[in-house]
Amino acid sequence: MPPVTADRRQPLLVVGHGHRSAPPMQIVEAASGLCDLLWLIDESVPDGAFTSRLLRKVGTVLNIAGMTPREAVSSLQAYSPDGVVAYRDEDIVFLSLIAAELGLEYRTPEVARRLVDKLLQREALSNGGLSSPFCWEVPADRSPAVIESFAELVEYPAVLKPRIGNGGQYTMPVADAADLVRSVALLPTEAGGETGMFVEQYLPSLATERGERFGGYVSVESLVAGGEISHVAVTGRFPLAEPFRETGFFIPADLSEAQLAAVLEVATDALRALGVRTGDCHTEIKLTPDGPRVLEVNGRLGGGVPEMLLQASGVSLFGLSIRIALGEPVVVDGPIPCGGVGWRFLFQPPTSARRVVSIEGLDRLAALPGVNEIYVNRSPGDPIDWREGTRHYIYSVYGVSADYDELMEINRFLHEEVSIAYE
């Protein structure tokens, strides 16, 4: 697609893009017939220039390397964009500042910060009347003496995590004060970035009615237009790999009618407490003995969720998201009915592994009915580090099954028939 010109016939959507963004070709396909695309990308990061060259084939590209939001606005004004959208956490606040300057409908900078900073988010949820675990901010000084004193203030069991981050990166369970001191010592210097780390009380899990074969929490995909909230899909989980690494997701979640109603009510309350009036959100909710409790709210679509929903229902979540970003009053009577179970597995290495030696059996996995795509994320020879969280998975598998029993057979196969050796 040539650069956008003043006589364009379609609306123009600004899309933040970078490492771990949503697949660009899926966005291009969803935008077809709806709008032209203008990609914001930092060409100074690894692979940034290469990605920029590819994106120029499917839209206009603005290199924002070293730019402040105000400087980006100065460059964007010539294009007169009609909307902005972010599909990764790193772009949400930046785009909120741009949208505010350009007068475009998006999250306010205040709401955007609540959506990416988990400590600010906890405060807003609590102020909004939702039951939230107690939290403690880790001191910037992580010297042993300071952390030992801090650890005595925390109630256990608890979870150590970054204020800003995703995918379970640098997230660890802590059983007691000594465990917290050890866990903080394991953190690399960059963990937590400028905002730092915090500790929150651990929420106990309640198994779903199907039993322990599925994980004890779900996520809700929501679209918000003009303050109207539509819950489009509820995603189920397989049990986490230690300590908090995702292993598999599926749509629809296997919940009773009562559980589903309670989960959707909590998701609605959370979005209202955070002040979300537009855009898409991914709310993770744990099923506890005291009812559903919010783990976190992300101001974007969940990773892999659009692909799973498309396979299970034929509905394009990216398409709905783009229409909202362009100002359409989209309302969906959800959760959307599914004709099967769309799923994505992420095979996680053990915490003792440091490098991949070999992978065998993926060819046989690919031949199974319902398997649509396999992606190898860590090849033989690649280093791995469990502290990086979910993102250091070995391979992922997308597909669709007729029911949960077929889903479980895929799960059994990849754990028993695919062989991976590690150092």
Model-derived segments and spans:
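ATP-dependent carboxylate/phosphate-activation module, predominantly the ATP-grasp catalytic core
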Residues: 201-204, 210-276, 280, 298-320
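Conserved ATP-binding module of the ATP-grasp superfamily
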Residues: 131-133, 153, 157-160, 173-212, ...
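Glycine-rich phosphate-binding loop signature in dinucleotide/nucleotide-binding domains
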Residues: 75-81, 152-154, 193
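A conserved helix-loop-beta module that forms one wall/lid of the active-site cleft
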Residues: 101-170
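Short beta-strand-to-turn element immediately C-terminal to the catalytic PLP-Schiff-base lysine
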Residues: 138, 171-176, 223-225
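ATP-binding N-terminal substructure of ATP-dependent carboxylate-amine bond-forming enzymes
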Residues: 1-111, 120, 127, 141, ...
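Peripheral (often C-terminal) accessory segments that flank ATP-dependent C-N-forming ligase machineries
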Residues: 322-423
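Active-site "cap" helix and flanking loop/linker of ATP-utilizing ligase/carboxylase catalytic domains
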Residues: 7-9, 262-283, 289, 299-356
